[in-house]
C-alpha cells in the first residue's frame, strides 16, 4: 500500500525546478498480483450547513474509513479517500473573509488527520468577476495543505462565463507566482459542465448528502486487455467486455458498501486515470502503433472514450479519457520530443476529457493568454455539453522548452510547453 496519500503529497510537497532531463524507467507496475488497477479515489459527498465544522465532517470520515477497509479486504488497493462539498458560497456566503478561511483551515486539518483530502467545490458559480479571488486563492493554498477548489466557467443557461473566466485566469497566474514552484495550481481548476458526484479532484463537488463515488487508475488493465488484440474493431470489443467484467465487480462491491452503511453509491468514473506506472499514453500507442501525437492519436482517443461512455455499469463524473501531461511518463516524454502541443491537447479534448490537465506553461504567460486557453476549454465543453476543465501550471521563471523535474513520487519530469 502507498502510505502517503496522493493528494496529501500534492498539497504538501514538490516544487518544480529546472534540471537536466532524466528519463524514467517504466518498470513493472506495483499492483497487487490479483488486480491490474487501483481505486484512485473513494469520494464522499458532504453538503454542509452554514455552521460548517468538525461535527459535519465526522460521519463522512467514518464512512470513508469503513468503505476503505471493506474494499481493501476485498483485495482492492485504495489510493485515496476524499470529501467533496457543495459549492462553497452555499455554506460560507462570506467565503473571502478571514473567518471563513479559518473555518476552511480547520476542516483541512480534520480531513488531513484522517488521511483524507477535501474539495470545496466551485467557489464562483455565476458569471461574475471577483477581483479579490486571485489573492484569496493564493492565501487559501498557503493556509491549507489538502484543499482543492474550482471556478465554473460555462453553463447551459449562460454559455461561457467570461467574467468568471477572468477570475480563474487571474488565480492561475497568482498561484503560479506565489506558491512554491507554482505547485498551488495542482489544487485549482477552471471547470465547465463538471457534474455533481464527480470523484476526481480538483473539480469534485456534491449536491446530495450521504452519497459517494469511485474513480479508478486503470491503464495497466487496458494494456492487459489489449494484449494480442489487433485492429480497432477487435480492440473496441475486447475493451468493452473486459471493462464491463472488472468494473461490474467494483460496482457490486460499492453497492454492498452502500447497503451496509446507508450511503448511496452514485457510480464509477470510468476514466482510466494514469500514474507513473500506469500510462494512458502507452495504451494509446499500443492502439496506434505510433508515438503519441502522431496521426491516429485522435482516433485512438475517440475509441477509448466511446468505450468508456458505452459501459452499462453505473458511471459518473468525466467517464472519458484523461491526458494529464505531468502525471504520465509517456505523455511527458512525447511533449519533450515536440510531438504535440497545447493546441493538440485541445483537439484531443474534442473527443475526450478532461481538457488541459496538469499542463506546464511558461511562468510569464500573461493573464489574457491563460484566459484564452481556459475560454477554449469552456467553448469545447459548451459545444459538446460535456465535462472539461483546465489545470494549467505556470512555472515560475521558466520558459518554453525548459525541463522541469518535480521532487514528487507522483509526477514525472516534463518540459514547459508553449501556452497555445
Which residue stretches match the model-derived regions?
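N-terminal secretory signal peptides and thylakoid transit peptides that target proteins
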Residues: 1-20
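C-terminal segment of N-terminal export signals and the immediately downstream linker at the start
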Residues: 2-4, 21-35
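Anaerobic metallocofactor- and corrinoid-dependent redox/one-carbon enzyme cores
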Residues: 31-420
